[in-house]
Amino acid sequence: LKLNWKLFGKIHQQIYRLSGGRLGARMGWIDVALVETIGRKTGLVRSVPIACYPYRDSIVVSASNSGKDSHPVWYLNMQANPMVTVQLGRERFRAIAEDVADDEREALWDTIAKLNKHQGEYLEKAPRKIPLVWLRREDSMH
């Protein structure tokens, strides 16, 4: 039985949102953020659960798209409009999405691959440079 990741993501997102972040904020030992972007074509709010990792004062996410040859839609949305809203557990905050600079990327990728073996596999498999995106806190929305 193959898992339908798109359906899983929609269900995960609903549980996360309805529980106020009490459920769905972790998958195993990996933190998961619910990230809202603005659709670059529609202008509508789009929400997606994304594995995240501590970075500086906030979090970083990998635009791995499971190692596919194209960037995930949420990353393209962030490129068009970098202002996002993040729910990390029970905390919500506004953030600005910024690609991690090349001089920090390699060390950060090493850390992420140790925390999540799938990300390391995606990095090896992908025929493109996988962006790491820093979701830099703009303010707190308690």
Task: Describe each PLM feature range.
Residues N65-Q119, E124-K129, E138-D139:
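Short, structured beta-strand-loop surface elements
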Residues W134-R136:
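Short, well-ordered beta-strand micro-motif
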Residues V32, K129-L132:
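Short hydrophobic/aromatic beta-strand or adjacent loop that forms the aromatic wall/cage
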Residues L1-G9, T37-G39, M83-R92:
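N-terminal short leaders/motifs
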Residues I30-S66:
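Short beta-strand segments
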Residues L1-K2, D139-H142:
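Basic/polar N-terminal segments that are highly enriched at the extreme N-terminus
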Residues R22-L23, T42, Q119-L123:
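Short helix-to-loop capping/linker segments positioned immediately adjacent to catalytic or ligand/cofactor-binding
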Residues L1-R26:
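Extreme N-terminal tail/first-helix region
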